[in-house]
Amino acid sequence: MRRVLMVNFGVLLLFCFGVLSNSFGQDNGGDSDINSTTAVYIVTLRQASSLHLFQQEAEEVKRVRDQSKHGDTSKFTRPKLQPRNISRSRYWRSRRSAIAQAHDSLLRNALKGEKYIKLYSFHYLINGFAVFVSSQQAETLSRRREVANIVLDFSVRTATTYTPQFMGLPKGAWVKEGGYETAGEGIVIGFIDTGIDPTHPSFNGTDTSQRQYPIPNHFSGVCEVTPDFPSGSCNRKLVGARHFAQSAITRGIFNSSEDYASPFDGDGHGTHTASIAAGNHGVSAVVSGHNFGSASGIAPRAHISVYKALYKSFGGFAADVVAAIDQAAQDGVDILSLSITPNRRPPGVATFFNPLDMAMLSAVKAGIFVVQAAGNTGPSPKSMSSFSPWIFTVGAASHDRDYSNSIVLGNNVSIPGVGLALRTDEGKKYTMISALDALKNKSSVVDKDMYVGECQDYGSFDKDVIRGNLLICSYSIRFVLGLSTIKQALAVAKNLSAKGVVFYMDPYVLGFQINPTPMDMPGIIIPSAEDSKVLLKYYNSSLVRDGTTKEIVRFGAVAAIAGGQNANFSNRAPKIMYYSARGPDPQDSLFNDADILKPNLVAPGNSIWGAWSSAATESTEFEGESFAMMSGTSMAAPHVAGVAALVKQKFRKFSPSAIASALSTTSVLFDNKGEAIMAQRAYANPDQTISPATPFDMGNGFVNATAALDPGLIFDTSFEDYMSFLCGINGSAPVVFNYTGTNCLRNNATISGSDLNLPSITVSKLNNTRTVQRLMTNIAGNETYTVSLITPFDVLINVSPTQFSIASGETKLLSVILTAKRNSSISSFGGIKLLGNAGHIVRIPVSVTVKIASKQ
């Protein structure tokens, strides 16, 4: 008897969409009610999906026609389907209907007389459905011969004005694409996220130059129409928008008024990520009345299609996400951007075998480049939350702009801080008053300790004491949790006629990044607990008290706030952010490593300006604003999605792996000061605050948009290669067959991860010697390349050939022999650099972990 595979792991940012079906199945006379053991299951069937069947039949037609050209068709039967004579849309409609009917028939026959709710029928990327049933019914379904796999649905939750300049787009990649006026035009980027605010100028159907967008004829998506997403919300820029919440609705946790039963973004995250990748060029980013510059997406003329599957009140569920991926592929998106990661490793034979990664594998087979955030679970080794080689995983790095603020005390000590705030009057210092020393009821000890110091309640304070002075407030964990807000403290300070606000850090607030927050009055947040102690020590030592009563008779501490609305561009950058998830890539839940490099790349992800929804609530400090500054790998991924759109625009026939190769081999290893890129809490030196980054911190390096448009050589990987890799995993044959229909027993060419034709070489265990090969294709002109090596510690590298000439369109094989020089379990890193005489530089990082030398 086949067992039901129970998978229950959370995900750090997911969005979804699919073929919506809310069919309620009940056999005649059935009276068995759905009980407390019911749950949503994702069921995969053995029959191939529409996409796989279409491609198989198309290949068969081609084979017959090729044979006909040679005059021999006796051994072949012409397939019933001839893709040349039937439109894809007609084919998909017929297949969708047939597969959905088959799903309904299976459920009726298997669950006779019992109740169930089918949520979705998946037909395009995978053949299966999501269904709400009891555990006993799930067991019954698992015994059906048509059923390949049953997985318990799991919960999911959420995980630029300047960055185009920092990435060199205005004088580089945009110029190569004809300027920002055409950069990304004709390419559709799909976003699985929290939706979008269609009223934002970043998504207008005409850009700031009033040029209308063309119609992307290859795209067939639609726009939902609802009261809060009315007709006309979409245009030639925003070409598709849908929402999916069937799993949440079935569970009874969906609140339509709060979560918006439409593609409208009530959270803000989806609007932000979409604008980073493809927001219109030249949109003014005004926050709290201050203009912070003109915003632009990385591919400002690319089209956007939104698939909403995350919601502000509960997050989301995997069944909806799989449906979203399935629908996006049917619609014809070119790029798929997911700022999502599981917060626990998927159980089973390998991390790659889960419904999301398998759906994304089929999307890649359909020609879609899939970008995923690495996760914000760094900096620990093996904290990577995006696993599969067909997914392009992006970590987060800084850029050189910051909005520094500071406060100068009366003793001339300057303390750094954050806050997009006004400055106090130049050359003048103001008296500081602690909120705890300005209470109307000074005997309320509990309130003083627990709440009042956060300056959230106007009625607690004596206005006469605070008027015209700087109010000192505490920043506690309640701000992190959203129970207290900067915005409320500022409102209180204004009502009290304070001149400004100073927030000091509660010592219990550890490990949280405090982003610059908009303030419509002078203010500053001191993020360091140690610096906060300096402030408080000065303040307390400056108080003058009555010798008998100990009451304060004079506040002696004074200070001036420098303000933080002006940007500085002097930081050393990029550097890898501490929260960005690190490699090595975990192959399974037992901490075994995969021979796959993760992350693939890093991109700007820290303090990123992006469009913000008018109803957004994810960041209370930006509530009501049209732009917000956010940080995370969620912000890094759409940067790469935008660059991928530029690459796809130039090279229309590039496969997803070719795009990945172009992005990877051209990446940057040095910062703006010409030094090696650094990482906070780097993999090799986790105890040091900052040290040189390794491939396990930054993958191939920092994204280089301009160079990616002229990579010289590419390394292409096929769907069949991925199948050979999956079949090469010990014990994977049954699950590979269940998910893909591929029989590993008939696949003689199994390979390891290091044998995949990737633009990197990763070996988790080097036992004496291993030879790996890479097949290179020249997409530029004739060129001669010379090999340069950086040898990993304790590893010997031999590369053949050491020099080669390659014609345009030609392919050549590069052979690399790795030999362990001595036993070691410490990871070592190096690289292979191919220097072309026409100026191309192709970089291949080499990572080796465990090394076992031969006995002499």
UniProtKB/Swiss-Prot annotation:
Pfam families: fn3_6 (PF17766), Inhibitor_I9 (PF05922), Peptidase_S8 (PF00082). Residues 22-159 form a propeptide. Residues 432-528 form the PA domain. Residues 164-709 form the Peptidase S8 domain. It is found in: Secreted. GO terms for cellular component: extracellular region. Residues 40-159 form the Inhibitor I9 domain. It comes from the Eukaryota. Keywords: Autocatalytic cleavage, Glycoprotein, Hydrolase, Protease, Secreted, Serine protease, Signal, Zymogen. This is Subtilisin-like protease SBT2.2. The gene is SBT2.2.
